[in-house]
Regions:
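C-terminal catalytic lobe of FAD-dependent flavoproteins
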Residues: 116-184
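A structured beta-alpha segment of the ubiquitous adenosine-cofactor-binding alpha/beta core
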Residues: 15-19
Length: 184
């Protein structure tokens, strides 16, 4: 296993090599940074920033709670994750005070127990044009694939969709038409 920035210039799709590594298949799962991928940069993926809070409190249900505009997810003893915001076409990775206050205001409408904010986090979702994940093969390179568009709703489907992707790659089992990138 290696962790490095991918250098597209080092990918040779004729010899199926990346630097010194030979491959049978290559799968890109780059999230919102797919726009930097010369093989798939035409896909309708846009960045959608989201911010979360982590809180500590006693007396809140240990069950996942949806309060209409925010969720309260248990992540440990007396710890919860609160989210989330949606800032379209924003790929900055800095949490903002305005979104923190927005989450606190929404949380206060449903949680009456005292709590302490211990973390304020943000990330960027890869949002597809139709908010449905994108899976499939490159139109010209038969062993190059993509799994993308796993925004906030689709991320829960990731285990199933990646299994479907492997079945498609290895056994040529068709992908569900709803997620097949050929729809674009």
């Amino acid at each position: 296993t290696r962790l490095e920035d991918f250098d597209y210039r080092s990918l040779d799709t004729t010899s199926n090599t990346y630097k010194t590594i030979s491959y049978k298949y290559i799968v890109f799962a780059e999230g919102y940074r797919v726009s930097e991928n010369p093989y798939f940069n035409n896909l309708p993926i846009s960045p959608t920033k989201g911010e979360l809070l982590e809180i500590e409190a006693e007396g809140i249900s240990d069950e996942f709670i949806y309060l209409g505009s925010v969720f309260v997810q248990p992540i440990g003893k007396n710890k919860w994750r609160i989210g989330s915001t949606y800032q379209q076409n924003d790929s900055s990775l800095n949490p903002t005070d305005i979104m923190k206050e927005d989450l606190i205001t929404k949380l206060n409408k449903g949680v009456t127990k005292p709590y302490k904010v211990v973390k304020h986090l943000c990330g960027v979702r890869p949002a597809s044009e139709d908010r449905i994940p994108l899976l499939g093969v490159h139109p010209d390179i038969e062993n190059m694939f993509i799994v993308n568009g796993m925004g906030s709703k689709a991320v829960s489907m990731a285990p199933l969709l990646t299994t479907e992707m492997v079945n498609y790659m290895v056994d040529k089992v068709p992908l569900p038409k709803e997620v097949d990138l050929s729809r674009f």
